[in-house]
Amino acid sequence: MTVQVAVALTKKTQQEQPMINERIHFPRVRVVDTDGSQLGIMSSQEAIAIAREKELDLVLVSDKADPPVCKIIDYGKFRFEQEKKAREARKKQHTSDVKEVKMRYKIEEHDYNVCINRAERFLKAGDKVKATVTFRGREIQHSHLAEELLNRMANDLQAVAEVQQAPKQEGRNMIMFLAPKR
């Protein structure tokens, strides 16, 4: 069982690595030089010889074309550039989290302002905000006051946020989702 796992892992890593130099098993390939000019169609052995003369590598760019396209480049530099592009793409991706702001419908003005400021900070950071009003005991009878509070919050944050989900009751909570404005 262990041998099969090792074989499967090596097959996967071979598929991820691009075909370079002797790994290219096509009899004839179209060769592109380092400056982008085409050298024409030739055998893969001739192309490898030309790449070796220039102290570079022959890298398979597209095996779907007929004949397959290979490029003469410095493989180490090529791989570094690809990894650099991947790192830059990962840096630019921002996963927006959902941050929660909890309060009660009988909230004091200062506490309400603190909640508004916190929600505004989350929204400016690009995160979504889940505003939750919790009820205890018989407070659930005053759900209209909680809805008014959440609508007031949406109104106060309309400069930086848009309502993604209007206030709705879920069990002993009333929730509303806000998303940052684009």
From Swiss-Prot:
GO terms for molecular function: ribosome binding; translation initiation factor activity. It comes from the Bacteria. Gene3D superfamilies: Translation initiation factor 3 (IF-3), C-terminal domain, Translation initiation factor 3 (IF-3), N-terminal domain. One of its GO terms (biological process) is ribosome disassembly. Keywords: Cytoplasm, Initiation factor, Protein biosynthesis. It is found in: Cytoplasm. PROSITE patterns: IF3. Pfam families: IF3_C (PF00707), IF3_N (PF05198). GO terms for cellular component: cytosol; membrane. Belongs to the IF-3 family. Monomer. IF-3 binds to the 30S ribosomal subunit and shifts the equilibrium between 70S ribosomes and their 50S and 30S subunits in favor of the free subunits, thus enhancing the availability of 30S subunits on which protein synthesis initiation begins. This is Translation initiation factor IF-3. It comes from Thermosynechococcus vestitus (strain NIES-2133 / IAM M-273 / BP-1).
